[in-house]
Amino acid sequence: MTNIRKTHPLLKIINSSFVDLPAPSSLSSWWNFGSLLGVCLGVQILTGLFLAMHYTSDTATAFNSVTHICRDVNYGWLLRYLHANGASMFFICLYLHVGRGLYYGSYTYSETWNIGILLLFAVMATAFMGYVLPWGQMSFWGATVITNLLSAIPYIGTDLVQWIWGGFSVDKANLTRFFAFHFLLPFIVTALVMVHLLFLHETGSNNPTGIPSDPDMIPFHPYYTIKDILGFLVMLTALATLVLFSPDLLGDPDNYIPANPSITPPHIKPEWYFLFAYAILRSIPNKLGGVLALVMSILILAIVPILHMSKQRSMMFRPLSQCLFWLLVAVLFTLTWIGGQPVEHPYIIIGQTASILYFLIILFLMPMTSVVENYLLKW
């Protein structure tokens, strides 16, 4: 008799995706982040659902409702901090996942890669709108600054901003619609994840060597399920440590002050995971130019497959490209640091230099290095 998991219409889909899926035998721990992202998404949806039961999306009561969750709701403080710090873990895993794709050449699966970029934008939009909901000072002013960037769009910019605001400033209408979209978007993200996996399973996984692994495959279960469970334990331990020992480590103290449109905080900045893009935005004096650079800092990932000049897929055997990759990582850390600093000397020039380097490495230095490495292969 055939096993039910191979014949049942629903179970056979799960079976072919997570049980009998042929996987390359050489996958390293860098391939754990896909499943970790799935866990992060699950944690965020569950904690968010329970938070939404107690939250009120009204400017008069939003801040107090978050206080009420932390003080009066059973384990409300735990839900709130799991959700806030879960977002940080989500972005850590997300950036490591993208970095793995860049390093090992996974971007050559263009459909999977492009859906991944869409996912990145969707998660960033969700996180931004979620940051506005507690209605603290940084929530209000962050929303004001970021939504105002749309006014840089020629002709329709100002009307577009007022349409998003639902008035002439960030207020009740804006908060309500941000809550609605913040609730909806994770489910759209879940649907996109399904499409992402669908395209991935059409081609099969890449592997660290970057060479076809068809002759050497192993079943996903039990080998990679055990490996993934270890990853879950490590990540959830890190998240629990962060939540229980220093829940406000990654937050902004200004967000414990209720939103006040008449008092501007000395330094308006987004959450830490957007600081690299914020630094690129600030490094260009022109408003429209800054907005374009901000969008391009993420959208540039879409042209990475076109810029792949190497005869080898992975960077595993390309030491020159490896040096450039780690330089790019250092530049991103520098941009993240600069994004949190005030706009003054020497931070301005450091930010501008790092921004130029960021685009220069991806657009010119990496393709040129690949060509040089191809030439060296002939020796």
Curated annotation (Swiss-Prot):
Q: Which residues bind a ubiquinone?
A: 201
Q: Which GO terms describe its cellular component?
A: mitochondrial inner membrane; respiratory chain complex III
- Protein's name according to its UniProt entry: Cytochrome b
Q: How does it sit in the membrane?
A: Multi-pass membrane protein
Q: Which UniProt keywords apply?
A: Electron transport, Heme, Iron, Membrane, Metal-binding, Mitochondrion, Mitochondrion inner membrane, Respiratory chain, Transmembrane, Transmembrane helix, Transport, Ubiquinone
Q: Where in the cell is it found?
A: Mitochondrion inner membrane
Query: Binding positions for heme b b566?
Result: 97, 196
Q: Which Gene3D superfamilies match?
A: Cytochrome Bc1 Complex, Chain C
Q: State its cofactor.
A: heme b
Q: Name the encoding gene, please.
A: MT-CYB
Query: Member of which family?
Result: Belongs to the cytochrome b family.
Give the stretches traversing the membrane: 33-53, 77-98, 113-133, 178-198, 226-246, 288-308, 320-340, 347-367
Which PANTHER family does the entry link to? Answer: CYTOCHROME B (PTHR19271:SF16)
What is the annotated role of this protein in its UniProt record? Answer: Component of the ubiquinol-cytochrome c reductase complex (complex III or cytochrome b-c1 complex) that is part of the mitochondrial respiratory chain. The b-c1 complex mediates electron transfer from ubiquinol to cytochrome c. Contributes to the generation of a proton gradient across the mitochondrial membrane that is then used for ATP synthesis.
Which residues are listed for heme b b562 binding in this entry? 83, 182
Q: Which InterPro entries match?
A: Cyt_b/b6_C, Cyt_b/b6_C_sf, Cyt_b/b6_N, Cytb/b6-like_sf, Cytochrome_b, Cytochrome_b_C_euk/bac, Cytochrome_b_N_euk/bac, Di-haem_cyt_TM
GO BP of this protein: mitochondrial electron transport, ubiquinol to cytochrome c
* Note, other: Heme 1 (or BL or b562) is low-potential and absorbs at about 562 nm, and heme 2 (or BH or b566) is high-potential and absorbs at about 566 nm.
Extract one GO molecular function annotation from the record: ubiquinol-cytochrome-c reductase activity
State the free-text cofactor note: Binds 2 heme b groups non-covalently.
- Share what the entry says about its subunit structure, partners included: The cytochrome bc1 complex contains 11 subunits: 3 respiratory subunits (MT-CYB, CYC1 and UQCRFS1), 2 core proteins (UQCRC1 and UQCRC2) and 6 low-molecular weight proteins (UQCRH/QCR6, UQCRB/QCR7, UQCRQ/QCR8, UQCR10/QCR9, UQCR11/QCR10 and a cleavage product of UQCRFS1). This cytochrome bc1 complex then forms a dimer.
Broad class of the protein's primary localization? mitochondrion
